[in-house]
Amino acid sequence: MASHSLNTLHTVFEYIWDRELPNDDFTNTLTVLGRTYAPGPPPHQEKAPDLRTLFHKFKPDQAADTEASWPREFLRDVHSRIWLTYRSGFPLIKRAEDGPSPLSFGSLIRGTVDLATVTKGFTTDAGWGCMIRTSQSLLANSLLQLRLGRGWRYDQTRECAKHAEIVSWFVDIPTAPFSIHNFVEQGANCAGKKPGEWFGPSAAARSIQVLCEANYDKTGLKVYFTASGDIYEDELFELAQQGAELRPVLILAGIRLGVKNVNPLYWDFLKKTLGWPQSVGIAGGRPSSSHYFFGFQGDYLFYLDPHVPQKALLIASEAPHESPDPNHYVEVESGLDLDSVHTNKIRKLHLDQMDPSMLVGLLVENRASYDALKHSINSHDQGSRFLNVYDSRPVLAAKSSGGLEESEFVDLGVLSMNEYDAIDDCDVGTCSALLRKERAFSHPVLVAMDPEEPEEIDASIHFDKDASILEKDPDRANETFEEIHVSETESRFEPDEPVVVSHDSAAVM
């Protein structure tokens, strides 16, 4: 009886969540990853839906009417995007001893929990894997564009071997190059994430970076990650240049465009990034959850929602049968359910509802593509953009580090450390773009020790005129600075590549 009630409740939630979204904007152009579509003429006025249909499945003619309100070519483009979602029933991901429990109220409601394995680990990512799934979607669509071109369209009646191969790299088994198992493993290695813990943009980006490098022979794709939004040409070229040409490289920018919401100052530039031909979408951008954003209309962003539990995407493992881990093997069908990674359901979110923490993806296929991207970035007003291109990292020389190790960083120019205290769900390494305009510097700075210095040095902290004052009352000036221990900075910040800042202001502008 209880099981039947849960299934009924799950069906109701699924119906409400899965309802078609009609087009109600016939003025603004539709944009999908660099392609634009006319909104089309408004349909005839329709009656409001009967609320009595709430507990009934959507009728085919109703779905057709909703679908008809969107331009056909726009729908074909959306339907061709690879859509990776929650899955259940995949090979076990072992639980960490001090990690989250696979059993939760949400998993019971969704009906995705496997009670037979719940004490051992996870066989579903429902409730915690949305950032992984949207990052997989971003990467999968990058590979789709790289191998099949932006004009390719999914056709259910025709089999495309390259498309099927790309999807097979993301199936839910440990041996697939970009499976959730490998993302979880790299999340632990790169960001200390335990199975069942929610990823942020930085953990997702670093996982993509490591996995793409490990599987470069398959993908032919390099990954450049910036946690500040700043792209340094010398580093990018060192990573991807081959002679006079540039090999394909995926630029990932882990950024935060506000404290609780996206600052309206960045709205225009955010939409422009989705309109560039190099755009492969945005992962993140919803409080305590993540979506894959692929386009916009007016001030609304279109997205694919990963919060739709489906049966695990499985194909036969290529691992040798003498593998010591029996969890690598499950009973699977020989075919690949390609239809389950595509949808034509349209969802959109207003920019003022978007979470400011996100991962922006840009695919550079060659040198001409990079030059065009650089021009697009530089043509926008610097005060309202969150991406910048520099020849190289600026340099700051220091006589002593006061005992800092080479891997430790000091962040200069933050208005108040309390800005970071307010960001509970901020992923490590993604906060450096916060309040860029009010900061003396926008990057973590590596301060190197001068080997010529004597052993006894002044290790005290000295503040310059740009140092942040936490107390505005001048009478309490002696209480205005907080002491920040190294252990605290390590727990709050995950350093990106070392950044050095020059006294020459022209180098940073």
Swiss-Prot record:
One GO cellular component term: nucleus
Family statement: Belongs to the peptidase C54 family.
GO biological process terms held by the UniProt record: aggrephagy; autophagosome assembly; mitophagy; piecemeal microautophagy of the nucleus; protein processing; protein transport
InterPro entries, alphabetized: Papain-like_cys_pep_sf (IPR038765), Peptidase_C54 (IPR005078), Peptidase_C54_cat (IPR046792)
GO molecular function terms noted in the UniProt entry: cysteine-type endopeptidase activity; protein-phosphatidylethanolamide deconjugating activity
Name of one Pfam family that matches: Peptidase_C54
Keyword tags: Autophagy, Cytoplasm, Hydrolase, Nucleus, Protease, Protein transport, Thiol protease, Transport
Protein name per Swiss-Prot or TrEMBL: Probable cysteine protease ATG4
Function: Cysteine protease that plays a key role in cytoplasm to vacuole transport (Cvt) and autophagy by mediating both proteolytic activation and delipidation of ATG8. Required for selective autophagic degradation of the nucleus (nucleophagy) as well as for mitophagy which contributes to regulate mitochondrial quantity and quality by eliminating the mitochondria to a basal level to fulfill cellular energy requirements and preventing excess ROS production. The protease activity is required for proteolytic activation of ATG8: cleaves the C-terminal amino acid of ATG8 to reveal a C-terminal glycine.
Originating organism: Pichia angusta (Yeast)
Catalytic activity: [protein]-C-terminal L-amino acid-glycyl-phosphatidylethanolamide + H2O = [protein]-C-terminal L-amino acid-glycine + a 1,2-diacyl-sn-glycero-3-phosphoethanolamine
Enzyme Commission no: 3.4.22.-
Keyword Protein transport applies: yes
Intracellular or extracellular location(s): Cytoplasm; Nucleus; Preautophagosomal structure
Active site: C130 (nucleophile), D305, H307
